[in-house]
């Protein structure tokens, strides 16, 4: 099976006792189109790579007219997504691998699950699995350099996104029966990208946590304390957001001020105006009056 999947002729696909296809679906400018690729995967994955729209765009850092120019997608990450799907597909289910290209992301779907551990354990590059679902296939793909030899593939995808100041990949839509990789190809929150651009020595761990914040996903209390201490985030859980430093850099000062809330003098002025109208206010009324004016981290 390994030989047929990687280097077998298309006309020999019938010798396999399962489907061996990658379906590419593309959603662009209101149109939907695509293609179907089969064996030999060592060649057809490169053909599919050539169909994916990839281009450079600019990110302007704070107080500079010289932009950072980055690729929408990292070529190695695209191939990693496809090759991992081939390597870890549960072929007994007789299902196809699906690559979906949207305007701002790529999605890779294959049947099966993470054979050992959770994807988050592989982000730092420290975990090495003890066994694989398709050992012969994986060994062959390692030998011809289709996949990483030290199981750094997921780590390298995350590092590449950080190095290009883009949102992190995720497997959040995965289930017990299917692995789904989402690879962003555009900016979600400009503040996040400018934060990475201004702090290129930021650890990958911090970048992943900051990515969780920009996507509105929960992070642990310890992570919140860490990011807050480093001046990367502000706000009151669950309403976390980037710090004032980045807000100024991206013309979101008004939005930041609303999240930051009024200062003491402004709150006092607000109370006095209310007293001029109502003459008397109880504590409960004052609390209600000021609650939406207080900062999220009050």
Name every feature range the model reports, one short phrase each:
Residues 1-298:
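C-terminal regulatory or interaction extensions
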